[in-house]
Amino acid sequence: IVTLDCEVKCSNGFPDPKIAQEEMLSITIKNHQSKRIVVWGVGKFTTDREDVTYVECESEVHLLKEFLIFWEKHLPDCISGWNTEFFDIPYICNRIKKLFGEDELKRLSPWGSVQEREVYKMGRNHQVYNIQGVAALDYLDLYKKFTYSAQESYRLDHIAKVELGESKDGNPYNTFSEWYQKDFQSFIEYNIQDVEIVDKLEDKM
């Protein structure tokens, strides 16, 4: 199982994964067994953590190429994350399609098949992708189904506080775009924190 989280630019409000017009800034994955983390990012980041590997990329195109090479070498049985079904997976798939075409998208699947469909949920249609041969567990969905108490918010930072007693670092700047433009180091640390929290929730559930 790998836990996945991506961050994208947001110059025009919250990015729509179906349109996927904003460039990707980073992808972070954590292997649930080895606990190792790999981050691809388009900026400077340094870490002395032995469990974190950072791949500095020149551009989003470079980032996605490196990510696909790694993915094919270390094909996971299952992807997990927080709202990955409706955000991270469709966003990554749509950017790959936009930049490289349909054939490159097929590289995500051991069977060379990635299928797109529409799902009606929370009062609207969502585009989702099924990566054939790779199971997907969205912990936001599982959490809603298997916990008995309704939460005032299902944001990951709120659930982390409720379930783990952990506070997630917030944005120290006025806007999200200011954050990644001015302090890429803490921005990536935030991205890493996301996969670590989901990994801990996974252990707990």
Give residue spans per PLM region.
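Conserved RNase H-like, two-metal-ion catalytic cores of nucleic-acid enzymes
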Residues: I1-C78
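Short catalytic/ligand-binding loop motif for oxyanion handling, primarily in non-cytosolic enzymes
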Residues: N12, F86-Y91
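Active-site-proximal helix-loop-helix substrate-binding element of RNase H-like nuclease domains
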Residues: I37-W40, T47-Y54, I89, K98, ...
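Non-transmembrane alpha-helical segments in soluble domains
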Residues: L68, C93, D199-E202
